[in-house]
Amino acid sequence: IIKVNLIGRLKGGVNTKDIALELLKKYSVKGGVGKVFEYAGEGLKHLEIPQRMTITNMGAEMGTTTSIFPTDEITKEFFKAQNRLGNFAKFVADEGATYDDEITIDMSKIIPLVACPSHPDNIADANDKKFKDLKVSSVFIGSCTNASYGDIKKARKKNL
């Protein structure tokens, strides 16, 4: 189990997919094979359920067995909004749990990233000069990693 402590808060123009891409840079497409990524830290209070889903879904790109977040008040409110509060259960790490590895990601230091062809771990800074004159003729919004109402609403505001 790899514990990923998330601290800080994402800056404008950065989203949770950038956190997942940062992890892909570190671990590659096979770095998560046979591993569980467990997310923790004070930064969780800044992540809504769809954002957490983006991170866990992107875990598959690293080959992870699974990715998990503890339940908290945000989770409880999500269940309540779905009329499923009766299904809510407390799910947190045991006191004194040990891990095979532990890393910390300061979300305030994450920059916008791009997954380039032809592998998900071919990651580049979105502001890299190689993208300066790149013309984008179409985009795809709706995958398991960016299909929440919030993602689609942002794209609409940008006229994508």
Please name every model-derived segment:
Residues 1-160:
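Fe-S-dependent hydro-lyases/dehydratases of central metabolism
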